[in-house]
């Protein structure tokens, strides 16, 4: 009898706790309920605008995952159409069994022109690399290299809707050089470069080059930290303070235009190297494998995106560069991609350089 009473008391307590939890969930200020309500509202508005097809449900899940918000039914319909076209391209590509795969990501509701406008910089003539100053040696290079294993590669960042890739490539190289030299990590200011490096033929959110960013830092006297000069993703007035400079550039080293042997030597034996290449439609949907293209160019005026080469290797018999991007850790292979090596693919060795820090 006593056991029965205890069991009944336990059930009543559990029911009371469940009721209390239920009432707490239903409270309007409960953040979980707010998220669920927001998800249902977004899904409802999308399905109302484009119907209840399987593709529509896929689009609704995509919009929720990437925090999309659309102002009107017309905007939903437009984005759904773009998403559907990109999805068809992705599926068609993946059926071909090529060396890399594509997948849906946060850019899948953008047209190619929209993507280019907000994520890529204008083509820059990197004439400084026509005659490089990296010195080759007879040292034997390792078969593969990944500087992440040494702990000097900083976390992947996101440039947002600003063509400031060149600043992230630059800070990535500087952060690696700093960690290598001083044994500790640092996060440096991309925004300072966006706002302040214009006199060195850089154009803020409209593009620039790491080699020119290194020259700016060298002659300007230093670069501040991300904390001291935070990123906004917009062109702004220069707020540099020499008192808060965290790193100085003594010099920069350029890889001879197109010389992948020099680039491999530098990546193997020195540290990560800033590189640039031409992004063509399709690359934005990269999801894994070794990227290759027959439509991208490799001339100095072709390149439109700067990144950071952090290693190299071979996958499925195809040699590749291991490269850190600036489109967030959700893009590609945790923010990284592999690019075919040996053909100066898309100009990967056309505008390459690395800094020497103090």
Swiss-Prot record:
This is Vanillin synthase. It comes from Glechoma hederacea. It is an enzyme of class 4 (lyase). The lineage of its organism: Eukaryota, Viridiplantae, Streptophyta, Embryophyta, Tracheophyta. Pathway: Aromatic compound metabolism; phenylpropanoid biosynthesis. Pfam families: Inhibitor_I29, Peptidase_C1. One of its GO terms (molecular function) is cysteine-type peptidase activity. The gene is VAN. It comes from the Eukaryota. Disulfide bonds join 162-205, 196-238, 296-346. Its EC number is 4.1.2.-. It catalyses: (E)-ferulate + H2O = vanillin + acetate; 4-O-beta-D-glucosyl-trans-ferulate + H2O = 4-O-beta-D-glucosyl-vanillin + acetate.
């Amino acid at each position: 009898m006593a056991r029965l009473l205890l069991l009944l008391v336990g059930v009543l307590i559990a029911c009371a706790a469940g009721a209390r939890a239920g009432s707490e969930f239903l409270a309007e200020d409960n953040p979980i309920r707010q998220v669920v309500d927001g998800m249902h509202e977004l899904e409802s508005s999308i399905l109302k605008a484009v119907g209840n097809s399987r593709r529509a449900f896929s689009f609704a899940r995509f919009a929720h995952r990437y925090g999309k918000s659309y102002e009107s039914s017309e905007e939903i319909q437009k984005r759904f159409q773009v998403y559907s076209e990109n999805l068809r391209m992705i599926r068609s590509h993946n059926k071909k069994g090529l060396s890399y795969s594509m997948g849906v990501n946060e850019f899948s509701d953008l047209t190619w022109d929209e993507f280019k406008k907000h994520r890529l910089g204008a083509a820059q003539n990197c004439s400084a690399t026509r005659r490089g100053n990296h010195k080759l040696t007879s040292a034997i290079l390792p078969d593969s290299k990944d500087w992440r294993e040494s702990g000097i590669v900083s976390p992947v960042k996101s440039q947002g809707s600003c063509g400031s890739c060149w600043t992230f490539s630059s800070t990535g190289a500087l952060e690696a050089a700093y960690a290598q030299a001083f044994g500790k990590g640092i996060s440096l200011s991309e925004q300072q470069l966006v706002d302040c490096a214009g006199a060195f033929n850089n154009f803020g959110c409209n593009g620039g080059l790491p080699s020119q960013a290194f020259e700016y830092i060298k002659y300007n006297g230093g670069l501040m930290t991300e904390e001291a000069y935070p990123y906004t993703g917009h062109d702004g007035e220069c707020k540099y303070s020499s008192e808060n400079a965290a790193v100085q550039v003594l010099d920069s080293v350029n890889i001879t235009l197109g010389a992948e042997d020099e680039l491999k030597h530098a990546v193997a034996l020195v540290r990560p190297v800033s590189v640039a290449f031409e992004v063509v439609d399709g690359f934005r949907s990269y999801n894994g494998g070794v990227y290759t293209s027959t439509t991208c160019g490799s001339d100095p005026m072709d390149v439109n995106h700067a990144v950071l080469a952090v290693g190299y290797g071979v996958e499925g018999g195809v040699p590749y560069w291991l490269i850190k991007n600036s489109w967030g850790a959700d893009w590609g292979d945790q923010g990284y991609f592999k690019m075919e090596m040996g053909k100066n693919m898309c100009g990967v060795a056309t505008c390459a350089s690395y800094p020497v820090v103090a």
